[in-house]
Amino acid sequence: MKKNYYALAYYYLTRVDNPQLEIALHKELFKDLDVSCRIYISEQGINGQFSGYQPDAEHYMNWLRQRPGFSNVKFKIHHIEENIFPRVTVKYRKELVALGCDVDLTTQGKHISPKEWHEKLKENRCLVLDVRNNYEWKIGHFENAVLPDIQTFREFPEYAERLSKEHDPATTPVMMYCTGGIRCELYSSLLLEKGFKEVYQLDGGVIAYGQAVGTGKWRGKLFVFDDRLAVPIDETDTDVAPIAQCSHCGVGCDTYYNCANTDCNNLFICCEDCIDSTKGCCSQECSQAPRIRAFSPSRGNKPFRRMHLCEQVECEQVEKKASSCCCSCSH
């Protein structure tokens, strides 16, 4: 397939006086475009993940940069074959990154470019801190990075407190990174509040590093919050050796699935052989659960985010057997 679509990752912290207006304008614009997205807007700014047919994506980027306050938005672009989100989602979220605490965005770490980051890694002088969730860094991270065992963004403030006790903030330089950069905008401020004097953040995140440097000091793949789930950071180097293992047999693997037990639905890493033999379940216990989603190898590892998606798949399967479907879900 030709890669006629763009995947866009972007954020911009700026004062937005009327977030609801920006949301409404986004939704109106997208009505006639071949796009899908997950975009959050608040008084703090915008945080977006977007996919679209190339001309429509170009139109959106130009349109957003013409909106008051958004002229300096930087988009990180990947070439893809199709839309990677299930629908258009544009909504208000008070916290662009759900930390659960107030953060002083006027004090942040020093932004360094991907190439500066690459050179600084060679010095081996700083504590390299991965501020993503554990299921993200499990399949890919920088060499020798500190990998916090956290499962949600809200756990980072507590981790920052522990870090300040494990390392002397006055003498420990920190280099932090995340997927696209927005988490570091907030997390670097937290570390500065904890007394760390020298805090650097990778400008544009791992995505920008891959585009500017290539694989470099990165190992494995990058977890992304869309239908792809895992991608090489360098589009020209797709033969990436896995650093994770199948949760069932231990073979090298970096493919995530949602457990077919709809009451579990947890992400887990699994190889092709085991996902087939376990019918898509993460454990023996889940394979005996009362509500198990029919596993379809042809669907691949496309994520299930909500129960209604399970119901939709069931309806699609019924449609193949009958000329009509009487269910209430949309197709």
UniProtKB/Swiss-Prot annotation:
GO terms for molecular function: oxidoreductase activity, acting on paired donors, with incorporation or reduction of molecular oxygen. The keyword tRNA processing applies. Disulfide bonds: none annotated. Its EC number is 1.14.-.-. GO terms for biological process: tRNA modification. Keywords: Oxidoreductase, tRNA processing. InterPro entries: Rhodanese-like_dom, Rhodanese-like_dom_sf, Rhodanese_C, TrhO, TRHO_N. It catalyses: uridine(34) in tRNA + AH2 + O2 = 5-hydroxyuridine(34) in tRNA + A + H2O. The active site is at 178 (cysteine persulfide intermediate). SMART domains: RHOD. Residues 122-218 form the Rhodanese domain. PANTHER family: RHODANESE-LIKE DOMAIN-CONTAINING PROTEIN 7-RELATED, THIOSULFATE SULFURTRANSFERASE/RHODANESE-LIKE DOMAIN-CONTAINING PROTEIN 2. Catalyzes oxygen-dependent 5-hydroxyuridine (ho5U) modification at position 34 in tRNAs. This is tRNA uridine(34) hydroxylase.
